[in-house]
Amino acid sequence: DSFIPIFEKNGFITKIDFTVLDQVLTYLRDAMDNGEEAVPISVNFSRSHNETPDFVEQILSRLQKKKIPPKYIEAEITESIFMLDLTALTHNLHKLKESGISISIDDFGSGYSSLNVLANVEADVIKLDRKFLSYAGEDSKAPIFVKYLIRMMKRMGYQVLAEGVETKEQLTLLHNAECDMVQGYYYAKPMPIPAFREFLKEFNK
């Protein structure tokens, strides 16, 4: 969190994002060529890309070069992007959706956007900020809020993913709230590609 604003300011963050995308595409291509299961992977894109006219075209050209179907990439944007030019953002999200790339809004509820933004955003997945779960452990009203927030988002047509799941109690809360997906240390910590391959094999047994 401390170095990202610096890279956004000097413009280096866009190079980092595309380097990560290239590594993801290389992994997917290798997995497909070796007959391994290929799963969709989320790639975070900084709000700085909103000012780049050919942002979507750069993504698609990389997919075409590696011959990766768009369905294997999820473009992940943080909710802070809604502070920028919504016209350009809406245009880019629409082009991504048209191409077959899914879109997720990361860290939702971290303090930038409001719920009414969701009514006009083309996204597939809303990722609830980990703060919601930390509040749920401290405040008796928080689980009720989380439950109805998830229910509202699902009724709007979004899939909901909860970030920062670390305990069985948190998982049970989300299961009872009918949350679609979870991520967090309860299942796994960040890992290198070889370890991820083994994890995927074991997880699918």
Protein language model annotation of sequence segments:
Residues 10-88, 164:
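Catalytic core of bacterial c-di-GMP phosphodiesterases, primarily the EAL and HD-GYP domains
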Residues 3:
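Conserved, function-defining core regions and hallmark residues within catalytic/recognition domains
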Residues 44-53, 72-87, 99-205:
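EAL-family c-di-GMP phosphodiesterase catalytic domain
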Residues 59-62, 91-99, 148:
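Catalytic-core regions built around general acid/base machinery
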Residues 9-10, 139:
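Residue-level signal for well-ordered alpha-helical positions
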